[in-house]
Amino acid sequence: MTVSARTRKTVYARDNHECILARVSHRFNPCSGPLTLQHTVGRGMGGSKLFDTADLLVTMCNGHNTLATSDADFARYCTSRGLVRSRNSTRDPRLIPVLYWDGWYRLEGETRVPVHAGDAEEFMRLIGAIRDGLVA
């Protein structure tokens, strides 16, 4: 499935036309390649239009997008930041906050709704996305 041009434009604008990890210091590779969209919920074989909505997409450089699916440590790091979410979770993936460089947010289409850091981290621990202080 292909993300619509309108949704792509909305997500890029919401994320300031930069990789969501561009301003974050982390031990993984720096940004590389053109911008692309990262589905926060894996679509699996064949995909589904249900996951092609702005609240389930973030902007990533091609390098980080590739690492998110090919490097287990980086995938765990992304999970702890809400950038990768389990498709099999019993919780609505839209409720999972995302950690940007300037704080936690819940994504609502073209809007980032601020979430208190303590509340976001407690929620992430509850769903098993944060273990052993993985969020950096």
Name what the model sees in each region.
Residues 27-40, 69-78:
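Short Cys/His-rich "knuckle" micro-motifs
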